[in-house]
């Protein structure tokens, strides 16, 4: 075999290997289309037109309590919710930073519940926020700030190395949404049809410590600084749990 043919065979082999690697990586990654839909929310922002007057950031209390459809129909306000399950304040900071790379809303609404956590809740929740972000230097910073001791950057760069063990857990959902994903939210709002209005609101449980950590205050100040630099109004809220 000539050197030229050997080179062609080698390049073809490399190409096929890369294609198969990317195929199985996409197959093994969770789809979040039929179960744990919260994991698909972050990625939906980049599919939407970037012309929002209001952007919400925070945990489940924003994507379950605020309706962009209602804001538009009743008040003519365009909005999007960049919420995710158990989103930490440093993840909110980097999601805002990521948002400002693409658009400049007039108002940013941040739900302060996450200030009670000064460390990552779990890798699973990290994944539901970080895997959906587009790759950029901001995502790299977000991953570094969020990783638990057991996690590594390579598993975010190449998720195959994190999810390859799912081969025995694959379901029809993994194949059905391998090449396409449906929208599961309305501008980041996740409709929960099983939620019923509360008839009785119980008293809040007392906490052992009501102080927030320095780390949380630092990121809260970072959010404030980003908004001030861009002339954005920052609204802090605590939505019902």
Language-model-detected regions and their locations in the chain:
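Acidic/histidine-rich, surface-exposed loop or edge segments in extracytoplasmic proteins
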Residues: 54-55, 76-81, 199-207, 238
